[in-house]
């Protein structure tokens, strides 16, 4: 195997180019240029993963890696109750203004009552396993290419609505490759989420 490390796009991405070539694109320690933290939100990169860095451990020909957040180094994913996200989107004047300027962006108000849970696994790669159970019953997990609501609230809205500036490119951003969804049976059920890396 030939691994190589790249950066600059501020997102975490592991791409297996072929059977022997692996690209590790590492998100920046500054995330989205420190801007999400400046707004008293969590420090996030454009993939809505936390600011951080990668750690590579090499033992002979064997290599392992992990992503370490500057906030909680052991945390590898975040889950969202989309019923609660829909409530926030419905009540927020800032969200309404943002969506009025960018109607092509995902309107999470439509998630109300669906009992969906989003899971953002920021260093996900196809060799990882994501298992979600509800009362001992395994739920189907689907990968979804959409935007992360926390990043919209923490970065896009403060950089547009709060400043009264509406960059054209904000209408085309947002799709994340590290988001997964499950459907819970009800709004108050408990889910157990387990993410296992390739090691």
Feature locations, PLM:
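Conserved beta-sheet core of the metallophosphoesterase superfamily
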Residues: 1-97, 102, 139-140, 161
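Long, low-complexity serine/threonine/glycine- and acidic-rich segments characteristic of extracellular
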Residues: 90-199
